């Protein structure tokens, strides 16, 4: 029987093969199918959002299966509320990595206390989650009464939170210059629509987080090199995560033709499928920084499922118990 590590690695390869298939079809996160995943995957019972590779994995499953509900939870979590998985449905594996542990030590006074120590080798486990549409009679998704943001206002706000200057100029390229720490974009009128401008803006802002005084990623290699492709992949996924947190639809198009990028990404992750998950981890850091800067000045739109899920177990218990009357006391 395979252990947790082998199972997780097998599932990683399966996902990356699917992503590569999408790339070979000529798209990655900018087709209408991906717009289903504009609301990031969230757990309605624990009230948390899935992060990193788990976030991307569940977004990909929304696209693959055509789900319109962004909510995911384990079978046990559903059953604790009295809901059960439909017959024949299969869950999606999510990973949990542990990099540190609490070690019992004694302080200078001889009293026992705990300190955090790094593990020599990370420990991995996994769990499986199911989309709410796979659950019998689960309350339908309300959409959180979410309204699409005013993109003109949102774009201006995003730009105002940038850690480096952003220049909009009548020219043909969108790029971040590490040496000058400046982002240059074409004019907004040169884009297909505002969503496409926002998507390109966040991609370049994602690159800017790699500066030495920020997240300190290496900008290595010319266009077409492996180092260049790795950084582009991180910026693309980082922008994707940020778009979902800001409520921006994912169906926008980049200003430039990304077919060359797609080919370079295929080469990187085909040779090492774990590189895709390393990119997702870095992308989460990118998004956390961009969103952190944004929330210093503005509030995020309400994207988490705010409604409380009815507990059917307690409802059934109340129904089963006879009403207590004065005569029965």
For the regions a protein language model found, what residue spans apply to each?
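N-terminal accessory/interface modules of nucleic-acid-binding and processing proteins
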Residues: 1-328
């Amino acid at each position: 029987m395979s252990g947790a590590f082998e199972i997780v690695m097998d599932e990683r390869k399966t996902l990356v093969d699917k992503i590569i298939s999408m790339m070979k079809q000529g798209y990655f996160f900018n087709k209408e199918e991906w717009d289903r995943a504009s609301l990031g995957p969230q757990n309605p019972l624990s009230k948390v959002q899935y992060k990193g590779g788990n976030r991307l994995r569940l977004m990909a499953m929304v696209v693959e299966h055509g789900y319109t509900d962004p909510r995911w939870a384990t079978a046990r979590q559903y059953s604790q509320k009295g809901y059960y998985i439909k017959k024949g449905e299969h869950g999606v594996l999510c990973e949990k990595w542990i990099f540190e542990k609490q070690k019992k030590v004694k302080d200078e006074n001889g009293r026992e206390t705990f300190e955090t120590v790094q593990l020599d080798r990370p420990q991995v486990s996994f769990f499986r989650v199911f989309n709410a549409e796979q659950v019998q009679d689960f309350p339908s998704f309300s959409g959180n009464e979410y309204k699409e943001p005013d993109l003109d206002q949102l774009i201006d706000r995003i730009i105002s939170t940038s850690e480096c200057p952003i220049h909009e100029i009548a020219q043909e390229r969108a790029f971040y210059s590490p040496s000058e720490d400046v982002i240059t974009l074409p004019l907004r009128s040169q884009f297909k629509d505002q969503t496409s401008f926002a998507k390109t803006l966040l991609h370049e802002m994602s690159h800017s987080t790699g500066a030495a005084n920020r997240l300190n990623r290496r900008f290595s290699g010319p266009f077409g090199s492996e180092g260049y492709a790795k950084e582009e992949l991180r910026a693309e996924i980082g922008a994707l995560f940020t778009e979902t947190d800001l409520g921006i639809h994912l169906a926008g198009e980049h200003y430039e033709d990304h077919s060359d990028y797609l080919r370079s990404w295929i080469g990187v992750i085909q040779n090492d499928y774990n590189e895709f998950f390393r990119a997702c981890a870095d992308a989460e850091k990118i998004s956390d920084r961009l969103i952190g800067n944004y929330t210093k000045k503005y509030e995020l739109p309400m994207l988490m499922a705010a409604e409380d899920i009815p507990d059917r177990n307690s409802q059934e218990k109340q129904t089963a118990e006879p009403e207590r009357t004065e005569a029965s006391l």
